[in-house]
């Protein structure tokens, strides 16, 4: 009797322990069911950066004159135009590159583009201009920007002036964009309009513009044009005008 009662007691203890374990599991499951389920974090899609406004454009920047050809001469300082053209053109190059363009320069120092030997019928000036055009053609330029300074007998004349080839619709649009940004950024006393001009560099079959950045015959404007900060401002304005054109007329959209 005692042995049998001991076995029953042991069985009862085991049953109680099992029931307790089951109850604990059920309680834990119930508590867990009340917790908010966290969804797995989806993988984030990395968006590619927006292309720069002049990405894919090859732009020829031509600092006018150079070497034997000094261009106009500033009335007060006597500085030759060729030096200021180069300083501004290098700023144009920097600003164009910052906007994604591939820039080709016709010169980076004080030099002309004449050869030592040339046909007798070919003047130094003509050969210089032809070689500038040849650089644009060889590099398949999509746009040409020729940088110059103006000069006039009336010292009161001032302000930037942009020229394009007569009959070149794309060139006229480019010149208009350049003129607008130059006026907006430089706020000249006289707001000029882009004009048609007969310049050799504008005869290319791509959008081309010749930018007269200001008048070296105007003392106040001469002082500005000799200042590196103003040269950088002019360069940035020209690059912004080129970008404005590219937005209106994407590369290859129309002939000049």
Model-predicted segments: where are they?
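Catalytic-site microenvironment of enzymes
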Residues: 1-256
